[in-house]
């Protein structure tokens, strides 16, 4: 396992900016508003190819043990507790604070190897800044400006000198066999609670306060001999209610997670039914062409009448995606977890199935013979052949003539026919229709000598009259 380095400090000292600089990504949300980061976010630093290590970004410790601030602090402490090296980040512009003193006292009790990182030294007198933090008694001090990428090399040298060859960090691998699952939905429907339930630990901060999760956090999981990557995302609200820049970034990260996943689990709240915002999120999943499982959370607390009402609303509002399986779960109590994973497996298998050209052509031939396209204003579309065009979602490219007049109802017939024939569940199916260009359009066949002579005779005959 790779060594693990944790970034720890009070809010808004630049931990996420350092994380992005070390990992050469923009995986961590960065904003000048305190408290943007809440959950632990892991990445890999490969700036030194000989000594890669895992970096964990943590939320700022604000000195409050209650509510979201307390949950964020517990996440930061958990990260520091499992780290091989702690980078204690402070703000060089603001100087040492009483909160920095409290964090330092806790780090000394933790007794982990620690390096003091003074960030935001651009525009300051570095010697003055260093002297202010000298009372902390660190022999290992790095002064840098993460926003301008100044001092990152010096930080790497300090980190590299103190890392063990083997560490506590587990690398998020890129194993193609690992199923990538994104949990998406409105705020406060239970996404983080569900991920924590599946992991068996409080890996994500779960709270009744809407908008607790602000970033997309990926965690690897092995269950029943299979590999997964679970992606917890921020709740998506109506665009008119997204006011803060941080929340706009969070929404972007959620949409990005949908694009990168293989299966999207759309979480609904059984107590609220299907809202317009749920339909909007579903639209983003369908636009991305991702496999879909609908998870109806908080099902255990509903009466028989409420469940019947919820079922009726589900069939009316989500009837256009009746190919997606709906699973009734309780993230809090753990009911429905096995059924959820079974639905995810079926959706993933359908979305990634590889088709042969012969089997899809046979299916098209049977569909065509069973129900030929109708005549539209005297024109009938002809479907000549089809071939696979990709997976996730399954895509079929149909070639033929007069396909522009092929009605939408017939396209839906083909989709339903292929779904039934190949037992495709939980995934969109796309058809691309292409008309072959007529190679003789605009060209005339050259006349033979016999045809030329005949044409001359006809012309003489016409002139003679």
Swiss-Prot record:
GTP 1 binds at residues 9-16, 57-61, 119-122. Keywords: GTP-binding, Nucleotide-binding, Repeat, Ribosome biogenesis. One of its GO terms (biological process) is ribosome biogenesis. The keyword Manganese does not apply. GTP 2 binds at residues 185-192, 232-236, 297-300. Pfam families: KH_dom-like, MMR_HSR1. GTPase that plays an essential role in the late steps of ribosome biogenesis. NCBIfam families: GTPase_EngA, small_GTP. Associates with the 50S ribosomal subunit. This is GTPase Der. It comes from Xanthomonas axonopodis pv. citri (strain 306). The gene is der.
